[in-house]
């Protein structure tokens, strides 16, 4: 996969999945717009963006950050402190905050609760640690990753 387009496949799959959920009234999700600095007008955005996606399912607020990576490790520098803190605040207030990973080499999707990253002392997390601490979910026809069963299981615990 070309580095320039890293994350585009994951974003497309997630967008198709949430469109399916929204269309079938199973849940309500949206991709948050990423603020950009205008080169022509010189407008500067002062507030940092929080996470990629927000939504609601069965009365529970949900927020997640989508990350693609390749190789044996995911560098935690790809997660900004304010993003992780935001997800943890969501969890503190009885919502659900998590990470949606795509490992490009294996072409596999993983969902991991944000709290699983809390006490890491290294600057990266190995694919083996992700496999141990996350749930792998499959891509199904027509390009949908059905993550609602995982969300439901976390809500019901």
Curated annotation (Swiss-Prot):
Annotated cofactor note: Binds 1 Mg(2+) ion per subunit.
Protein name: Holliday junction resolvase RecU
Cross-referenced NCBIfam families: PRK02234.1-2
Single GO BP term: chromosome segregation
Site (Transition state stabilizer): 67
Entry GO CC: cytoplasm
Cross-referenced InterPro entries: Resolv_RecU, Restrct_endonuc-II-like, tRNA_endonuc-like_dom_sf
Location, primary (coarse class): cytoplasm
GO MF term (any one): endonuclease activity
Highest rank taxon of the organism: Bacteria
Alphabetically ordered keywords of this record: Cytoplasm, DNA damage, DNA recombination, DNA repair, Endonuclease, Hydrolase, Magnesium, Metal-binding, Nuclease
Subcellular location: Cytoplasm
Reactions catalysed, as given in the entry: Endonucleolytic cleavage at a junction such as a reciprocal single-stranded crossover between two homologous DNA duplexes (Holliday junction)
Summary of the function given for this chain in its UniProt record: Endonuclease that resolves Holliday junction intermediates in genetic recombination. Cleaves mobile four-strand junctions by introducing symmetrical nicks in paired strands. Promotes annealing of linear ssDNA with homologous dsDNA. Required for DNA repair, homologous recombination and chromosome segregation.
Ligand binding (Mg(2+)): 50, 52, 65, 83
Keyword Magnesium found: yes
Family label: Belongs to the RecU family.
Cofactor list: Mg(2+)
Record EC number: 3.1.21.10
């Amino acid at each position: 996969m070309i580095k320039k387009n890293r994350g585009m496949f994951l974003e497309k799959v997630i967008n198709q999945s949430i469109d399916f959920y929204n269309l079938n009234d199973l849940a309500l999700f949206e991709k948050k717009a990423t603020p950009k600095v205008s080169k022509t007008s010189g407008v500067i955005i002062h507030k940092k963006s929080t996470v990629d996606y927000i939504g609601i399912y069965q009365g529970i607020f949900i927020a997640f950050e989508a990350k693609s990576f390749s190789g044996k490790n995911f560098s935690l520098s790809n997660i900004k402190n304010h993003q992780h803190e935001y997800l943890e605040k969501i969890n503190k207030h009885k919502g659900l905050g998590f990470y949606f990973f795509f490992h490009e080499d294996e072409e596999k999707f993983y969902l991991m609760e944000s709290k699983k990253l809390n006490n890491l002392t290294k600057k990266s997390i190995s694919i083996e640690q992700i496999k141990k601490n996350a749930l792998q979910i499959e891509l199904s026809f027509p390009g949908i990753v059905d993550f609602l069963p995982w969300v439901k299981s976390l809500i019901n615990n």
